[in-house]
């Protein structure tokens, strides 16, 4: 498939917590869709090595969820550094979208952007400065058309690739049911 400035990059990170000043990225996944939200390519799904000290700093919620999903074990066994993850992800994205063209797409994507800005700046700079945040649409629908919220439910696996797929499906739902386009 050719590089297309209209393609959209969807990203999800799993982190050790919510504070970029103390927490770290432990998983990244990316998908590329066309502008109609059809998935055209799946990028690498990477567990990013972090030290036992960093992992021990996770709060109970993160210990439980990332432990049960197997992510903590994958992170401990990983040979992938943050720099490796940046390079592999950019190599993938550059096959489908020119640098600076796609907004960063996903759920609560502002949080992911904060971590990319702190730890993976070269990757953050690959995106346009705008965001397509499914969470924003969800919050508006919850307030303006709460009955519509019953039509979509998420599994919330807190695994990066599954979370991205759910974000795309959720945006497809809002497009059809709310925007009617």
UniProtKB/Swiss-Prot annotation:
Pfam families: RNase_T. It is found in: Cytoplasm. Its EC number is 3.1.15.-. GO terms for molecular function: 3'-5'-RNA exonuclease activity; nucleic acid binding. It comes from the Bacteria. Residues 8-171 form the Exonuclease domain. SMART domains: EXOIII (SM00479). The active site is at 129. Its main location: cytoplasm. Keywords: Cytoplasm, Exonuclease, Hydrolase, Nuclease. Coiled coil: none annotated. GO terms for cellular component: cytoplasm. Belongs to the oligoribonuclease family. NCBIfam families: PRK05359.1 (NF003765). This is Oligoribonuclease. The lineage of its organism: Bacteria, Pseudomonadati, Pseudomonadota, Gammaproteobacteria, Alteromonadales.
């Amino acid at each position: 498939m050719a590089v297309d400035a209209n393609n959209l990059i969807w990203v999800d990170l799993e982190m050790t917590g919510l504070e970029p000043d103390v927490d770290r990225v432990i998983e990244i996944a990316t998908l590329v869709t066309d502008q109609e939200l059809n998935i055209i390519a799946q990028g690498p799904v990477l567990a990013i090595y972090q030290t036992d000290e960093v992992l021990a700093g996770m709060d109970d919620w993160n210990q439980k969820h990332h432990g049960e999903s197997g992510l903590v074990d994958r992170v401990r066994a990983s040979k992938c550094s943050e720099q490796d993850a940046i390079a592999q992800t950019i190599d993938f994205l550059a096959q489908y979208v020119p640098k600076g063209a796609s907004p960063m797409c996903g759920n609560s994507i502002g949080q992911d952007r904060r971590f990319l800005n702190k730890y993976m700046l070269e990757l953050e700079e690959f995106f346009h400065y705008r965001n397509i945040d499914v969470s924003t649409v969800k919050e508006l629908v919850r307030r303006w058309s709460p009955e519509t919220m019953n039509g979509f439910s998420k599994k919330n696996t807190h695994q990066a690739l599954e979370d991205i797929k759910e974000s795309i499906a959720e945006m497809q739902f809002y497009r059809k049911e709310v925007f009617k386009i």
